[in-house]
Amino acid sequence: MIKGIQITQAANDNLLNSFWLLDSEKNEVRCLCAKGEFAEDQVVAVSELGQIEYRELPVNVAPTVKVEGGQHLNVNVLRRETLEDAVNNPDKYPQLTIRVSGYAVRFNSLTPEQQRDVITRTFTESL
Protein backbone atom coordinates (compact mmCIF):
# COMPACT_ATOMS: atom_id res chain seq x y z
CA MET A 1 0.00 0.00 0.00
CA ILE A 2 1.26 3.48 -0.84
CA LYS A 3 0.83 6.39 1.54
CA GLY A 4 2.09 9.93 1.66
CA ILE A 5 4.39 10.98 4.48
CA GLN A 6 6.04 14.15 5.74
CA ILE A 7 9.22 13.59 7.72
CA THR A 8 8.94 15.40 11.06
CA GLN A 9 12.18 14.23 12.73
CA ALA A 10 15.39 12.90 11.24
CA ALA A 11 19.09 12.69 11.98
CA ASN A 12 19.66 14.23 8.53
CA ASP A 13 18.48 17.89 8.62
CA ASN A 14 17.88 17.85 4.84
CA LEU A 15 15.03 15.40 5.40
CA LEU A 16 13.06 17.60 7.82
CA ASN A 17 9.66 18.55 6.37
CA SER A 18 10.34 16.63 3.16
CA PHE A 19 7.49 14.79 1.43
CA TRP A 20 7.60 11.20 0.24
CA LEU A 21 5.44 8.37 -1.07
CA LEU A 22 5.99 5.30 1.11
CA ASP A 23 5.45 1.88 -0.47
CA SER A 24 5.26 -0.40 2.55
CA GLU A 25 5.12 -3.56 0.41
CA LYS A 26 8.42 -2.82 -1.35
CA ASN A 27 9.89 -0.99 1.65
CA GLU A 28 10.77 1.94 -0.64
CA VAL A 29 10.08 5.66 -0.70
CA ARG A 30 9.76 8.06 -3.65
CA CYS A 31 10.90 11.63 -3.04
CA LEU A 32 8.29 14.27 -3.82
CA CYS A 33 10.21 17.20 -2.38
CA ALA A 34 13.34 17.40 -0.20
CA LYS A 35 16.36 19.62 0.35
CA GLY A 36 19.87 18.50 -0.44
CA GLU A 37 20.93 15.06 -1.51
CA PHE A 38 17.62 13.55 -2.69
CA ALA A 39 16.22 14.40 -6.12
CA GLU A 40 12.57 14.74 -6.97
CA ASP A 41 11.09 11.38 -8.03
CA GLN A 42 14.15 9.48 -6.73
CA VAL A 43 13.29 6.05 -5.28
CA VAL A 44 15.34 4.70 -2.38
CA ALA A 45 15.03 2.03 0.29
CA VAL A 46 13.46 3.33 3.50
CA SER A 47 16.63 2.34 5.34
CA GLU A 48 18.62 4.95 3.34
CA LEU A 49 16.72 7.71 5.14
CA GLY A 50 18.13 6.58 8.48
CA GLN A 51 16.21 7.04 11.72
CA ILE A 52 13.08 9.09 10.93
CA GLU A 53 9.68 9.96 12.32
CA TYR A 54 6.86 11.03 10.05
CA ARG A 55 3.22 11.89 9.84
CA GLU A 56 0.91 10.37 7.27
CA LEU A 57 -0.71 12.55 4.64
CA PRO A 58 -3.83 11.86 2.60
CA VAL A 59 -2.79 10.96 -0.94
CA ASN A 60 -4.77 9.79 -3.94
CA VAL A 61 -2.56 7.51 -6.02
CA ALA A 62 -4.05 6.26 -9.25
CA PRO A 63 -3.00 2.72 -10.09
CA THR A 64 -0.60 2.56 -13.00
CA VAL A 65 -1.34 0.31 -15.90
CA LYS A 66 1.64 -1.54 -17.26
CA VAL A 67 1.07 -2.66 -20.82
CA GLU A 68 3.46 -5.10 -22.36
CA GLY A 69 2.52 -6.41 -25.73
CA GLY A 70 -1.06 -5.28 -26.17
CA GLN A 71 -3.03 -4.67 -29.31
CA HIS A 72 -2.62 -2.34 -32.26
CA LEU A 73 -5.38 -1.42 -34.70
CA ASN A 74 -5.02 0.23 -38.10
CA VAL A 75 -8.31 1.19 -39.72
CA ASN A 76 -8.43 1.18 -43.51
CA VAL A 77 -11.86 1.90 -44.98
CA LEU A 78 -11.54 0.06 -48.26
CA ARG A 79 -12.98 -2.93 -50.03
CA ARG A 80 -10.85 -5.97 -50.66
CA GLU A 81 -11.56 -5.65 -54.38
CA THR A 82 -10.09 -2.13 -54.42
CA LEU A 83 -6.78 -3.30 -52.95
CA GLU A 84 -6.62 -6.34 -55.23
CA ASP A 85 -7.29 -4.12 -58.25
CA ALA A 86 -4.53 -1.77 -57.04
CA VAL A 87 -2.12 -4.73 -57.00
CA ASN A 88 -3.03 -5.62 -60.61
CA ASN A 89 -3.44 -2.05 -61.92
CA PRO A 90 -1.19 0.28 -59.89
CA ASP A 91 -1.54 3.11 -62.45
CA LYS A 92 -5.25 3.42 -61.60
CA TYR A 93 -4.47 4.09 -57.90
CA PRO A 94 -1.49 6.47 -57.63
CA GLN A 95 -2.96 8.23 -54.56
CA LEU A 96 -4.25 5.16 -52.67
CA THR A 97 -3.04 5.61 -49.09
CA ILE A 98 -3.38 3.09 -46.26
CA ARG A 99 -2.38 2.88 -42.60
CA VAL A 100 0.52 0.57 -41.72
CA SER A 101 1.91 0.47 -38.17
CA GLY A 102 0.43 3.88 -37.43
CA TYR A 103 1.88 5.53 -40.55
CA ALA A 104 0.13 6.64 -43.73
CA VAL A 105 1.74 4.91 -46.71
CA ARG A 106 1.05 4.85 -50.45
CA PHE A 107 -0.13 1.36 -51.27
CA ASN A 108 1.84 1.29 -54.54
CA SER A 109 5.10 2.01 -52.70
CA LEU A 110 4.86 -1.33 -50.90
CA THR A 111 6.49 -4.46 -52.29
CA PRO A 112 4.13 -7.08 -53.76
CA GLU A 113 4.75 -9.22 -50.68
CA GLN A 114 3.84 -6.33 -48.36
CA GLN A 115 0.73 -5.58 -50.42
CA ARG A 116 -0.44 -9.20 -50.07
CA ASP A 117 0.29 -9.08 -46.36
CA VAL A 118 -1.83 -5.93 -45.97
CA ILE A 119 -4.73 -7.53 -47.82
CA THR A 120 -4.48 -10.73 -45.77
CA ARG A 121 -4.32 -8.88 -42.45
CA THR A 122 -7.02 -6.34 -43.33
CA PHE A 123 -9.63 -8.77 -44.57
CA THR A 124 -10.20 -11.82 -42.39
CA GLU A 125 -13.15 -14.17 -42.11
CA SER A 126 -13.30 -13.89 -38.31
CA LEU A 127 -11.60 -12.13 -35.44
Curated annotation (Swiss-Prot):
Cysteines engaged in disulfide bonds, as pairs: none
Domain of life: Bacteria
UniProt xrefs under Gene3D superfamilies: 3.20.70.20
The keyword Lipid biosynthesis is annotated on this UniProt entry: no
Domain Glycine radical: 5-127
GO cellular component: cytosol
Pfam families: Gly_radical
Xref: PROSITE patterns: GLY_RADICAL_1 (PS00850), GLY_RADICAL_2 (PS51149)
Keywords annotated in UniProt: Organic radical
Keyword Membrane set for record: no
Glycine radical: residues bearing it: G102
An annotated Gene Ontology molecular function: formate C-acetyltransferase activity
Record's function text: Acts as a radical domain for damaged PFL and possibly other radical proteins.
NCBIfam families hit by this protein: spare_glycyl
Protein name: Autonomous glycyl radical cofactor
Recorded name of the encoding gene: grcA
